[in-house]
């Protein structure tokens, strides 16, 4: 699984850099199906999956769990193929589509994502171009349907939502993401 791979990779990097070995859980935001508490009582999971292979993998990992889908993506060479994994799942009670800002490619317009999901059989698709407002809407829907929220489609979308979460909670993003603070002793 992704968390095991991330842990192995961090151990290899630590060894090569001469860091003392330490037992720790590895969290890679957007890659390890991390839950984050955007709203108390609603399970919100984030995934940076953005291509057919990674979406297939991640959708298999949540098979049998009900969610509201929050989807935002940057432009793809073949959007239909990228979204194909969503045709093979019944996990989602609703979908909210939004924009994903950042990177070298522009966002897929939410109207286009909504059209593509409709062609895959999604009846209830809402459009909310602002990612924060889209997440708030997805959380409200999840409360109505007593299920979770699954955010996917872009590392930029994940980053934007994590940034907003940090801002809302008054957290320090730099501290939260720092593994080895400057000046920290890393050798035994």
Language-model regions, residue ranges each:
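Nucleotide phosphate-binding/pyrophosphate-handling subdomain across enzymes
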Residues: 1-94
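Short, flexible loop segments at boundaries between secondary-structure elements
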Residues: 39, 100-104, 170-188
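C-terminal helical cap/extension that packs against the catalytic core
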Residues: 41-44, 83-148
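Active-site catalytic pocket residues across diverse enzymes, especially alpha/beta-hydrolases
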Residues: 62, 90, 142, 165-169
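Short hydrophobic/aromatic-enriched beta-strand-loop microsegments
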Residues: 67-69, 92-97, 169-178
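Active-site-proximal loop/hinge segments that shape catalytic or ion-binding/gating pockets
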Residues: 154
